[in-house]
Each structure stands twice: as C-alpha cells, then as structure tokens.
C-alpha cells in the first residue's frame, strides 16, 4: 500500500480546491453582467431562439448613461479560433466605446459560438433567425429607438447580416465587412478550411447556397448598405463585394463602399 506524504496530500488538496474554484469561475462566467477593460458594465442575456425555444441565443449589450432612447448597433462576429462569440466585442471594449458615443451597443453570438446553442450552420437560416431574435429583443428595450437599429457584420457576420437585411426591411443601416454574397461564385473558396466548414455545416446543395447568398435576394433589401472589403482578402475575393454592389445599385438601394489596399479594414475586433 502506498501512503501519501504530507506534502503530496497538501498538493492534492490544493489542486482539488483550484479545480473547484475554476469550475465555479466557469459557471459564473455565463451569468450576470460583465465589465469591460474600461469599467463599462455589459449585460448578458440568454434569449430563446425564435425557431427553437429550447435553444438559447447569447446577447451582450450596454447603453449610454441616461434614459434615451438611443440608436442601436448590433455586431455580428466572424469565424473564431477561440469561439467566444459576442464576448470578443466586450474584451476589445467595442461595446463600451459605442455606448460612450451615444449608441445602445450589442453583440450576438452566432449558434455554435460563445454561449449560443448550436449547431453552427455556416451563416444559414438558423443563424439568421438567431440574429433576428436579438434584434427583436433590442427593439423592445425602452432605451432603444426601434426604427434606428443598425447591423455591423464582419466576415461570416457580414454574410449573415446581408441575409438578415433581406428579411428585415426596417433596419436603419447595414455595414458589411469582408463578406461573401454569392456562394455559387465563391465556392470552392480560396481556402480549403473554409470549404470543409461549408460542406460540413451547410452542405453543397443549390438550396443551401441560395439561402446564404444575398445577391439573389437583393430586391428585398430596403436599408442603406456600407460595403467594406480588401483588395487582397485571402478568404473572399473583392469581386464578391463589387458584384453585390452592382446588384444593389440596380435595385436603387443606397450604397457606399470602401476598399483597402491590403486587407479588409476591421474597426473593432480581428476574426
């Protein structure tokens, strides 16, 4: 029989206490407000998904001091190696920054990211409906001007935001950065990893591609669009933004574009 020494016993007890504290910390991380690096309080909500009430949609949001109402902006992240979802915008201080500028600022976690229930469907209908769930919540807040709600989507988030805009005609503005708007022309993509994710999460059917390609639904968009893209974007060729812009212009949608020489300009957080 092996008998533990006092030192070994103490070490094991210390590790047990550490593990318990770690688990408690993980549990508390998904409940209650957060505080960003500049001390701004961020609220965390778990909303029932509009098409699957047993699944939750994570929304993080904050507002300026005072009563409002204020315009609102909802951020939609791209793919992440560390899948922290909307919390990325808390860590960078983006939500607090926008609140100081007079906006109700929010970030939604796409299904399969952060604390939002999956599965991830590569910018598909389940993700689109999760974003619509978040928008509906924001518009009901007394601090929000419901007719002044805007979206900012980056990469995958831009794909989702563009499809949301085909369904929600009341959006005040939509900012799309580095997105793909025609899956038929994009696939196969420049990166094998993206191809694998598309095949696994959405499948390769015409129906799946059309459900994620805003170019084929552009006539339904009513909101002003700002397109941001990079000439050397390694994920999505610039032609995707140009073709989408031409389609929007043909439908008389107010549009502005900004092209950067090397890569997509990302105002708040890296993918």
Which role fits each region the language model picked out?
Residues 121-142:
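Alpha/beta-hydrolase active-site loop
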Residues 68-70, 78-117:
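Short substrate-entry loop that stabilizes the transition state in hydrolases
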Residues 242, 249-271:
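C-terminal catalytic histidine-bearing segment of alpha/beta-hydrolase fold enzymes
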Residues 84-85, 179-217, 223:
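Mobile cap/lid helix-loop segments that gate and shape the active-site cleft of serine hydrolases
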Residues 144-155:
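Alpha/beta-hydrolase fold nucleophile elbow
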Residues 30-67:
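N-terminal cap/lid segment of alpha/beta-hydrolase-fold proteins
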Residues 158-169:
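Short glycine-enriched nucleophile-adjacent loop
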Residues 221, 227-229, 233:
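Short beta-strand/loop motif that positions the catalytic acidic residue
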């Amino acid at each position: 029989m092996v008998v533990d020494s006092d030192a070994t016993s103490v070490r094991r007890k210390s590790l047990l206490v550490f593990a318990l504290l770690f688990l408690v910390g993980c549990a508390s991380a998904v409940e209650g407000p957060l505080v960003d690096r500049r001390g701004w309080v961020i609220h965390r909500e778990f909303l029932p998904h509009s098409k699957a009430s047993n699944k939750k949609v994570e929304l993080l949001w904050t507002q300026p001091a005072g009563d409002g109402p204020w315009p609102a902006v909802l951020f939609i992240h791209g793919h992440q190696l560390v899948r922290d979802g909307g919390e990325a915008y808390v860590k960078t201080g983006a939500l607090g920054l926008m609140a100081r500028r007079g906006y109700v600022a929010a970030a939604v976690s796409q299904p399969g990211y952060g604390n939002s229930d999956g599965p991830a469907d590569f910018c598909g209908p389940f993700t689109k409906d999760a974003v619509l769930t978040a928008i509906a919540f924001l518009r009901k807040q007394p601090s929000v001007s419901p007719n002044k709600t805007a979206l900012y989507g980056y990469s995958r988030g831009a794909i989702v935001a563009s499809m949301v805009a085909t369904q929600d005609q009341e959006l005040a503005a939509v900012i799309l950065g580095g997105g793909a708007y025609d899956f038929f022309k994009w696939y196969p993509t420049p990166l094998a990893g993206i191809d694998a994710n598309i095949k696994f999460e959405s499948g390769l059917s015409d129906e799946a591609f059309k459900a994620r390609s805003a170019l084929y639904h552009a006539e339904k968009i009513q909101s002003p669009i700002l397109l941001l893209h990079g000439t050397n974007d390694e994920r999505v060729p610039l032609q995707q933004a140009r073709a989408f812009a031409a389609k929007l212009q043909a439908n008389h949608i107010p549009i502005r574009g900004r092209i950067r020489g090397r890569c997509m300009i990302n105002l708040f957080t890296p993918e």
